[in-house]
Design a protein with these regions (language model features):
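Conserved glycine-rich Rossmann-like NAD(P)H-binding loop of the short-chain dehydrogenase/reductase
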Residues: 26-41
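Rossmann-fold cofactor-recognition segment
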Residues: 41-57
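Active-site Tyr-X3-Lys motif and surrounding loop/helix of classical short-chain dehydrogenase/reductase
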Residues: 59, 82-88
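Flexible cofactor-recognition loop at the NAD(P)H-binding site
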Residues: 14, 66, 70-80, 94, ...
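N-terminal Rossmann NAD(P)H-binding glycine-rich loop of SDR-like oxidoreductase domains
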Residues: 10-24
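Catalytic loop of short-chain dehydrogenase/reductase
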Residues: 78-79, 83-84, 103, 107-141
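Conserved N-terminal Rossmann-fold NAD(P)-binding element of oxidoreductases
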Residues: 6-12, 34
């Protein structure tokens, strides 16, 4: 049985995250969106959060109160942006947020980390963007 309560969603403003927000809303879930972009209409609450910036994450963590059903780490940036941003958002920020919210996830709650096929097949998919592939491989560990 799924835990009750709000779902924290990173990257819910665009792409896969926005599709996830729509599906969660359709299922009647309360969504707290963390993103650098504007809030999707499905979000019950929205916090501007730059996952490449630990102080931005800490600021949001200080505002999140209570227990949450799930943390869905969907936010990500492509390997075409600078390597520090790729690693910061796709791996280090995800870990920082997860570590910071861990004690607020319900006993039967879930943490889901969305990664790319590049973490499995990086030699075939992205040999020219190792800064993208490597963080995705790290998520598998």
């Amino acid at each position: 049985m799924a835990a009750e309560g709000a779902v924290i969603l990173t990257g819910g403003s665009t792409g896969i995250g926005a599709a996830t927000a729509k599906a969660l809303a359709k299922a009647g879930r309360e969504i707290i969106n963390l993103d650098i972009k504007e809030a999707p209409q499905e979000a019950s609450a929205h916090f501007h959060c730059d996952l490449a910036d630990p102080s931005s994450i800490d600021s949001v963590l200080g505002k999140l109160e209570g227990t949450f059903a799930s943390l869905l780490n969907v936010a990500g940036v492509p390997g075409t942006v600078d390597k520090d941003t790729v690693v910061g958002v796709n791996t280090l920020g995800l870990r920082h947020l997860t570590d910071g919210i861990w004690d607020q996830i319900a006993d039967k709650g879930t943490v889901v980390n969305v990664a790319s096929v590049a973490g499995n097949q990086w030699k075939n998919v992205s040999p020219y963007i190792p800064s993208f592939s490597t963080p995705r491989i790290m998520l598998r560990a």
